[in-house]
């Protein structure tokens, strides 16, 4: 609950604030400071309790009241769920739309195609956008092990940043790959102008099994933002500085 934009705010429930993965709980405490911008990212919760799905025998996960299903079918054969109410599925409108269409096709049109919840692209539409598809570096390390990964990354200067002195570390990209050839791409991350437009195209490539060998052999369209993915060569393992020269874009 915001008491004042430039004053104090009260955290009525629970909030984690920590620079490391170990969260620190703050409950019912007051923090005071002055802010230029206040972002309320409170998320959502499933309304399965309000809709009384338990009366139909549908089981939900106690911790978040969501339904666990890989094919939208609940534990009750004739009850289905799509969208944000599903446990550990992307909370995105296009995901719910696609899953609903495929479910309707299976129920009424003899369709067989299941919703693919892997490698769903998404973008955070902040003033400098962040777009991604596939695994994060942390999740890839958890699944594959750090020694089995190669992380390519680079800062870059968009053509839109025509002022030479502008900070070259505002825009960044990362490609998470398997280390063994042909280095299958597991995730792509992009911070910069029009990130959503850039990632949308690469999302299809990732779903088709894009490899880094294919990526680096692709001729980029110059000058575009998307071509930066075809130019990245520096790995985190190398320890080299991924910052471009001040004269380069």
Roles of regions detected by a PLM:
Residues 94-117, 146-148, 206-212:
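Internal hydrophobic alpha-helix adjacent to the cofactor/substrate pocket in enzyme cavities
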Residues 33-109, 201:
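FAD-site-proximal beta/loop scaffold in flavoenzymes
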Residues 18-19, 76, 167-170:
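A short, glycine/Asx- and small/polar-enriched loop/turn
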Residues 113-129:
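Flexible, acidic loop-helix segments that line cofactor/substrate-binding pockets
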Residues 125-136, 141-249:
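Flexible, glycine-rich terminal cap/loop adjacent to redox cofactors
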Residues 3, 7-32, 38:
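Conserved beta-strand-loop-beta-strand element in the redox core of flavoprotein oxidoreductases
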Residues 1, 5-7, 135-139:
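N-terminal glycine-rich dinucleotide-binding loop that anchors FAD/FMN and/or NAD(P) in oxidoreductases
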Residues 9, 59, 147-150:
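Conserved beta-strand segments of alpha/beta enzyme cores
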């Amino acid at each position: 609950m915001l008491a004042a934009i430039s004053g104090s705010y009260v955290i009525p429930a629970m909030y984690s604030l920590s620079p490391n993965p170990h969260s620190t709980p703050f409950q019912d405490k007051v923090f005071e400071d002055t802010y230029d911008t206040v972002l309320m990212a409170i998320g959502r919760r499933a309304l399965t309790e309000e809709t009384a799905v338990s009366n139909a025998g549908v089981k939900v996960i106690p911790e978040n009241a969501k339904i666990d299903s890989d094919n939208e079918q609940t534990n009750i054969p004739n009850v289905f769920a799509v969208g944000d109410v599903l446990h550990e599925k992307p909370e995105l409108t296009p995901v719910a739309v696609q899953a609903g269409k495929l479910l309707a096709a299976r129920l009424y049109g003899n369709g067989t195609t299941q919703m693919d919840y892997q490698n769903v692209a998404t973008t955070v539409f902040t003033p400098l956008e962040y777009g991604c598809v596939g695994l994060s570096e942390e999740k890839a390390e958890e699944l594959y092990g750090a020694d089995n990964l190669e992380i390519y990354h680079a800062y870059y200067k968009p053509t839109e940043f025509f002022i030479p002195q502008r900070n070259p570390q505002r825009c960044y990209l990362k490609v998470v790959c398997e280390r063994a050839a042909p280095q299958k791409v597991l995730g792509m991350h992009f911070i910069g102008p029009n990130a959503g437009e850039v990632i949308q195209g690469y999302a299809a490539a990732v779903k088709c099994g894009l490899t880094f060998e294919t990526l680096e052999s692709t001729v980029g369209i110059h000058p575009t933002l998307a071509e930066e993915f075809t130019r990245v060569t520096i790995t985190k393992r190398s320890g080299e500085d991924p910052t471009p020269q001040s004269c380069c874009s």
